[in-house]
Structure formats: C-alpha cells, structure tokens
C-alpha cells in the first residue's frame, strides 16, 4: 500500500509547480495589462530603462521567467536560449556574446512553496523578505523599483486575500 502522505505531497507539489510555471510564463503579459490600470506600476516601469532585464527563478527547479523592457515601456519574455551563459545573472557584467541577453536583476526564491505562497497571495513580498524566502542579485535602485512594481501588481491581483487587505482601521468611540 502506498504511503498517502507522500502521494498528497507529490500532488500538492505538482499543483504548485503548474501554478508557478504558468505565472512565470504569463508574467510579461500580467505586467503589461496591469500597467494600464495602475499609476504605481507605470511609475516603476518608467524608472527602468529600455533593455532592462530581470529574472524570477525558483531554487531546486528549472523554473525561471525572464522579462526585458522594450522601448515602448512594455515587457517581453526572453526565451532561455537567449540568456547569456558566460556571466552570472545579476552581476552587471556584459556578455562576450553580443546576441545574448544579460540579466540585470534576479529574484531567486528558496523553494517552490515559498514562490507559491508569494504568487498566490498567501503572503506579501514584505513578509517573504522577512522570512528570507528569496534572495536578490543586482543593483539596489532597480531592485527597489521591481519590488514596488510587484507589490502593486500582487495587491491588484490578490487584493481580496488576507495578506493584502488593509488592516482594519480603529473605530472612534462616540463621545
């Protein structure tokens, strides 16, 4: 008889993996759609220069999504084959291959469950950062812009989740 605990863990992992892969694949589309609805997202995108490239990845898997800002201010997905292999992503070093795309900033989640919790609205980026759910590589100024952009994006997408709802305001007592 199979151990049902490991079977459930396997199914849960596969469901989380499918969800995270789908969101990584859809990331440029989501950014491009939500930038039209949010001035905050637009402001952070405007801070990033055309050609700026960032990557979200999940340790222990081959899951990664790489996006590059266009001259028009939208983001396009970068296929894995086009990413520079001769320099560390987020290092700021140029590639010796002029056709390769160098990654300017990397957000690397420690594990699939951490990525899933962030991508599903189960916890905010601030909470995830507090528990060291991800590490980053790249310049701090653009990292802050990406963090603000993702916070606004996730709040719009998951505003109904407890992690993103505003704390209840204290009610005044009638005197």
Report each predicted region and the residues it spans:
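Feature captures hydrophobic
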Residues: 1-175
């Amino acid at each position: 008889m199979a151990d049902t605990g490991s079977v459930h863990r396997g199914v849960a992992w596969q469901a989380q993996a499918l969800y995270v892969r789908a969101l990584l694949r859809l990331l440029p589309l989501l950014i491009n759609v939500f930038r039209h609805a949010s001035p905050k997202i637009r402001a952070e995108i405007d801070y990033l220069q055309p050609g700026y490239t960032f990557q979200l990845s999940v340790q222990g898997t081959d899951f990664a999504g790489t996006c590059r800002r266009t001259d028009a201010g939208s983001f396009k997905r970068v296929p894995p084959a086009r990413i520079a292999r001769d320099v560390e992503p987020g290092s700021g070093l140029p590639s010796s291959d002029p056709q390769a795309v160098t990654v300017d900033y990397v957000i690397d989640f420690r594990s699939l469950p951490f990525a899933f919790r962030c991508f599903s609205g189960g916890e905010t980026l601030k909470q995830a950062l507090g528990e060291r759910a991800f590490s980053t590589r790249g310049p701090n100024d653009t990292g802050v812009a990406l963090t603000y952009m993702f916070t606004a994006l996730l709040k719009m997408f998951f505003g109904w989740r407890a992690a993103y709802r505003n704390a209840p305001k204290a009610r005044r007592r009638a005197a």
